[in-house]
A protein has these predicted regions:
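Phosphate-group recognition and catalysis centered on beta-loop-alpha active-site segments
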Residues: 204, 208-212, 223-519
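Hydrophobic alpha-helical membrane segments
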Residues: 1-271
Length: 519
């Protein structure tokens, strides 16, 4: 496997001396440009960068075939590639999905509709996409044939239909082996960067830039080697040694400059520690005043995030789940109970006991402890219709205590903002398609699993704060801090507090962020 991999890399290196050397350099420049635009600009500009990058591949094919310019063939190849890319979109596009997300910015109200109806369409769309993706493997050889010798859509469909799925999968094993080899080298490189952090941060920075540049170069050389197998004549030397050296040096400078820019420098702003549901590990029952008191005493978090939802008689109780079954062992939705049936209800979790509080009771304890709250208003029952009453009763006191409100339902924060414009409100979203510039949200609570550099940059360009939830593992805490998060919502605020200030491995975590961004 190693010998085949090395042979492929050497074949790719010969492309830098071949007739397509300038085209390969253009591809590297476009690939870097698209990523930089996605992070720095977004919107239409980064979408244009993606379109230019997508046009490069069919142009390369035409050049490799020595074809004269034919708009029809170019468009046919481009559409085939885009059609395939759509099925492979959820797999990340080697990091360019984040660029696409930064380019397509939907109004928050539209994203709100998509998310709030997810349980209606996702059970259908998810299996449908998975089935389509598995079937799409059958058409990969057909795509390759149409790129090298385009005929018609009919032949494309017929070729894919006739070939067996297992045959295609077996033929792709070399690709998997090369990917595994690249990943192993990335792991080894990451270990070296970690070790260099113990020497000094400057050494760690240099090693991280070197490793990231090398990994990018290796990926490109593997791609070039695969190209040489399809078009062997493109690896025949066509440039003098000094021209080859100049083109190679330019490519290395582009990749190295991008690596240095992407890795950046350690953030200087303090990270907000936000205790999720008011707990510190398993020190109490979530969303209870007993857990709140222990957490504040042990950790003194910057904010305590807690959940409220309306009752049948238009009061508010502190509860995360829509039903009482998990914590209280009682049937029925919370919003169907009157407040007097809920207040003081015994709750059990992790072998501990607590009592269900009204928001008024919980808020009073937080005020006594001088603890700012981040209140999540659950979108259940008539929550969005009660924002006027909520604002009248709690907005000014939340402002005075440096608190804030966020919700998964954009209608909630929009109506609350209309009644109390000075109260900080945030939009909770598990995925990012939002146009941050036209939103009442002053901050965003984003799902940590889908965190990207593009998300943070887009929000910061519009002077929005970014929190990530729910971040409980040390690796995730460190890498999201390195990525530039303004705060982390965690069930382990004590652990996060202990990790603060341990920045000697910043470049290791940024390298991890870059590797994760390929997914």
């Amino acid at each position: 496997m190693l010998s085949r991999g090395w042979h492929l890399v050497m074949q790719g290196a010969r492309q830098l001396a071949g007739p397509l050397a300038c085209w390969w350099l253009a591809g590297i420049l476009l690939a870097v440009l698209a990523k930089v635009l996605g992070i720095l600009v977004g919107g239409v500009v980064s979408l244009l960068g993606l379109l230019l990058l997508s046009a490069w591949l069919p142009a390369m094919v035409a050049r490799s075939n020595h074809e004269s310019w034919q708009a029809g063939q170019f468009l046919y190849r481009w559409v085939l590639l885009m059609f395939t890319a759509v099925w492979w979109l959820p797999l990340g596009w080697l990091g360019y999905l984040a660029t696409l997300q930064a380019s397509i910015q939907l109004p928050a109200t539209v994203q709100n509709i998509i998310f709030n109806t997810r349980y209606d369409w996702l059970p259908v769309a998810g299996p449908f996409w998975l089935l389509g993706w598995l079937i799409s493997w059958k058409w990969l050889p057909a795509l390759q044939r149409q790129l090298t010798a385009p005929t018609s859509w009919r032949n494309y469909w017929r070729t894919g239909w006739r070939i067996s799925w297992w045959t295609v999968f077996k033929k792709s094993r070399n690709v998997w082996l090369f990917l595994i080899s690249w990943l192993v080298m990335a792991i080894i490189g990451g270990g070296i960067v970690w070790a260099s952090g113990a020497v000094s941060q400057l050494v760690s920075q240099f090693v991280a830039v070197f490793m990231m540049t090398g990994l990018q170069l290796l990926a490109w050389l593997m791609f070039m080697g695969w190209w040489s197998r399809l078009w062997p004549e493109t690896a025949i030397a066509g440039h003098s040694n000094w021209q080859t050296g100049l083109l190679t040096l330019t490519g290395l400078l582009v990749l190295g400059g991008y690596a240095g820019w992407w890795l950046g420098t350690p953030p200087t702003a303090p990270l907000a520690i936000i205790a999720h549901r008011g707990v510190n590990g398993r020190d109490g029952v979530q969303n209870t005043t007993a857990a709140l008191k222990r957490t504040v005493k042990q950790v003194q978090p910057d904010m305590v995030e807690m959940d409220i939802q309306p009752t049948a008689d238009r009061h508010w109780v502190v509860m995360h789940d829509p039903t009482l079954k998990a914590l209280a062992g009682q049937p029925g939705p919370v919003h169907e109970y009157p407040v007097d049936k809920l207040s003081g209800l015994p709750l059990r979790e992790h072998g501990q006991k607590g009592y269900l509080s009204t928001f008024k009771q919980y808020f009073a304890v937080a005020h006594k402890l001088q603890q700012p709250l981040l209140v999540e208003i659950k979108s259940v029952g008539t929550a969005d219709q009660l924002m006027g009453i909520f604002a009248d009763n709690y907005a000014q006191r939340l402002i005075q205590q440096k608190g804030a409100v966020h919700s998964l339902d954009y209608r909630v924060i929009e109506r609350l903002h209309q009644r109390a414009a000075q109260l900080p409100v945030g939009f909770i979203t598990p995925f990012y398609l939002t146009d941050f510039s036209n939103s009442v949200a002053g901050f965003y609570s984003l799902q940590a699993l889908t965190a990207t550099r593009e998300q943070i940059s887009a929000a910061h360009r519009q002077h929005r704060i970014v929190y990530f939830w729910t971040v409980d593992r040390p690796l995730a805490m460190q890498r999201l801090t390195a990525m530039g998060a303004d705060g982390l919502i965690t069930n382990r605020p004590g652990q996060l507090r202990r990790l603060q200030g341990q920045s000697k491995h910043y470049y290791f975590y940024q390298l991890i962020n870059w590797l994760v961004s390929w997914l």
